[in-house]
């Protein structure tokens, strides 16, 4: 079924509003939980490449008629980023704690990428105080569930465990690939896959935890809240 483009023009116009009008439109027309989940995930993996492109904007026209953002193209994540100073995407630089590019609000007008772009929809979400608070609370939940704090024992780290699983699964193919094609001829040409995995763990995951939990946590900038205690509910007792 063919649909026109009136709704996308409506969205583009609506997110230019301010204050109560903007808040009302976002709550009425956006799938708030889905968008917040999407944004929190991009912060954990430090995705700078989804700001001006590399995402789908989907409207459930036959259902709740709400918009949400869907991910696409995640090669420049987990520390990888476009480097305008040289090399483009072919560089070994790890982006993990350099603000504004590594800030939790990257993508709004005050936290642009190193390609000097920002996203008006993301900016609209963060300009509404209630939605911003919801985002930061959800970000903390995702951090605790997936990234985990810097104090987490190494044996309990989920990201690192998953990386190790993938290395074990892919190693035979990786060895064949490197034997045939060698190591890419940019950056550190001596870096093999094992070294790259070690860098991912020590230079991205470890430092990302510090940046989000400490630099921007309650004891740092105060932006990201502390974890909330789950209330104890006893059913069947009064």
What are these regions (language model features)?
Residues 1-52, 58-238:
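Middle-to-C-terminal accessory/interaction subdomains
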């Amino acid at each position: 079924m063919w649909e026109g483009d009136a709704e996308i023009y409506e969205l583009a116009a609506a997110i230019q509003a301010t204050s109560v009008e903007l808040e009302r439109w976002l709550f009425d027309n956006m799938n708030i939980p889905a968008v917040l989940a999407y944004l929190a995930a991009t912060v954990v993996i430090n995705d700078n490449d989804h700001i001006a492109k590399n995402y789908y904007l989907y409207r459930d026209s036959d259902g709740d008629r709400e918009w949400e953002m869907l991910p696409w193209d995640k090669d420049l994540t987990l520390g990888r980023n476009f480097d305008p100073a040289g090399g483009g995407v072919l560089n070994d630089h790890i982006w993990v704690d350099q603000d504004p590019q590594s800030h939790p609000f990257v993508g709004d007008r005050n936290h642009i990428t190193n390609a000097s772009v920002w996203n008006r929809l993301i900016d609209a979400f963060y300009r509404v105080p209630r939605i911003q608070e919801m985002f930061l609370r959800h970000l903390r939940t995702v951090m605790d569930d997936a990234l985990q704090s810097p104090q987490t024992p190494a044996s309990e780290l989920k990201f690192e465990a998953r990386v190790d699983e993938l290395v074990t699964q892919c190693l035979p193919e990786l060895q064949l690939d490197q034997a045939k094609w060698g190591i890419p001829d940019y950056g550190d040409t001596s870096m093999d896959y094992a070294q790259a995995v070690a860098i991912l763990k020590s230079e991205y995951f470890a430092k990302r935890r510090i940046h989000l939990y400490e630099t921007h946590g309650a004891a740092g900038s105060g932006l990201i809240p502390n974890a909330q205690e789950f209330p104890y509910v006893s059913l069947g007792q009064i």
